[in-house]
Amino acid sequence: MENYIKIKDKFIIADPKDNVATARVEVKADTVLMTDDGSKIIIKELIPFGHKVALKDENRDEGVIKYGQRIGIATKDIAVGELVHVKNLSGERGMAK
């Protein structure tokens, strides 16, 4: 049996609509997390403290949601458990809609 860690022990999920979570602590690759609905997320790469992880697969040009608000768009496909940062996210702050 695998050892699971509750996702809320390692990450902050601010709103049920969020498709990213923020790391409370540094989280190593291959960490297995259990979500509230019983599904598991395997962390794909090191997630530094304060950085975001994808809670579901995101397609290129799809909105990234944090605090229940769209904070940017995916610039390439993002897999669940992957770091969400400038390498795959474009912020929309200050951009005309």
Where are the predicted features?
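Well-ordered secondary-structure scaffolds
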Residues: 1-66, 70-97
